[in-house]
Design a protein with these regions (language model features):
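Acidic/glycine-rich beta-solenoid
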Residues: 1-174
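P-loop NTPase catalytic cores that bind/hydrolyze ATP
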Residues: 179-180
Length: 180
């Protein structure tokens, strides 16, 4: 009755959205997005408010060769969890079983279903100082010291405004393309 959008179809039915309800302030309570991923296959994204809680991707091939794409790892009603600040705490499609956050709402530990972890250390201003990846019995520590990045105590990269220099092995220069 308040002229709110409840359904949307675009591209000859290749993409549709369905709003399943609004709260008293006019915020969307749930949104389902259907998109055609190939000639006859569709996917489904389900949101609760502005938080994603489920993605069903039925595509078996990539829309683009070697494209970065979503991998539908599980089929559950609630594939994502959030804390009271809206931070993602679980992503079952990526195998993330828990993400804990520090007092600045920055991720401090990410735990995966295979037992692997990523631990982050920050300065008081939120600057990332260290990342520790533990995969099985292998631990890789990356330290961020100004414009120099160290991996397991050895200089790896030197960052500059123009790009970066790979310091491991033979030095290689990589330049950023700036078109502004």
């Amino acid at each position: 009755g308040l002229n709110r959008l409840t359904a949307f179809t675009h591209g000859a039915g290749r993409y549709t959205e369905k709003v399943t309800g609004y709260d008293k302030n006019g915020n969307i309570l749930s949104l389902q997005c259907y998109g055609q991923t190939s000639a006859s296959v569709y996917g489904l994204i389900t949101l609760t408010g502005n938080l994603l809680n489920r993605v069903d991707d039925t595509a078996t091939t990539s829309a683009y060769n070697n494209g970065f794409e979503f991998k539908d790892g599980v089929k559950q009603a609630n594939e994502y969890n959030y804390d009271s600040n809206g931070n993602l705490t679980k992503d079952l499609n990526k195998g993330i079983t828990n993400i804990s956050y520090n007092c600045l709402n920055l991720p401090s530990v990410v735990t995966f279903s295979d037992g692997s972890t990523i631990t982050y250390t920050y300065g008081a201003d939120g600057t990332k100082l260290r990342t520790v990846h533990k995969i099985g019995s292998t631990t890789t520590t990356t330290d961020y010291c100004g414009n120099v990045i160290y991996e397991n105590g050895t200089q790896k990269l030197l960052l500059t405004e123009e790009g970066y220099i790979n310091l491991a092995g033979t030095q290689q220069y990589h330049y950023y393309l700036k078109d502004y």
